[in-house]
């Protein structure tokens, strides 16, 4: 069966053979290393959803587009999910209270890697920042063409407690209710 696995690219698919438990992952899961999520084509939120979807299939073997066959499929998918969670923690930690660029964050987070990988690493960091922004945990500010990111505390609607994004005080439903009162 064809399984939509957007994230690496918007139109990425994998193929699952139920009878044998074989999952052909293309670029979503590799035999070694991790897949690059490069915005705007790459979408980390969609990618994580795709990894969970592939895990729910309970494959036995992964046949990646690059690298060796993966015989411990569930362990590899868990490794990918854990890696992204670890990297997100590093991004938030590196942001701290500062306002920083993806390049500055990548230089710190990937300090143990050769400098020539930092440019691509900055793209991966950007994917995490975009995800964090969508979740209301980071914000982007642009001043005179300089784009910087900051961590923000998750906020809740002052009326109902639902999560809200950015610096608003009320969620959309409560805003409408207040206007109708």
Regions of interest found by a model, annotated:
Residues 18, 141-144, 165:
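Structural motif
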Residues 162-165, 179:
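Short functional micro-motifs and their immediate structural scaffolds
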Residues 153-156, 167:
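Short metal-coordination and nucleic-acid-contact micro-motifs, chiefly zinc-binding Cys/His arrays
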């Amino acid at each position: 069966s064809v399984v939509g696995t957007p994230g690496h690219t918007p139109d990425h698919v994998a193929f699952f053979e139920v009878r044998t438990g074989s999952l052909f992952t293309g670029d979503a899961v590799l035999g070694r290393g991790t897949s690059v999520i490069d915005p705007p084509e790459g979408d980390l939120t969609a990618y994580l959803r795709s990894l969970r979807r592939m895990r729910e299939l309970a494959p036995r073997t992964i046949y990646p587009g690059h690298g060796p066959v993966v015989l411990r499929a569930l362990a590899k998918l868990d490794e990918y999910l854990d890696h992204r969670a670890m990297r997100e923690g590093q991004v938030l930690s590196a942001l701290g209270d500062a306002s920083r660029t993806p390049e500055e964050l990548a230089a710190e987070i990937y300090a143990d890697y050769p400098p020539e990988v930092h440019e691509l690493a900055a793209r991966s960091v950007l994917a995490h920042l975009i995800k964090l922004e969508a979740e209301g945990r980071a914000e982007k500010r642009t001043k005179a063409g300089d784009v910087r990111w900051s961590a923000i505390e998750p906020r809740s609607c002052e009326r109902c407690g639902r999560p809200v994004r950015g610096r608003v005080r009320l969620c959309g439903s409560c805003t409408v209710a207040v206007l109708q009162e």
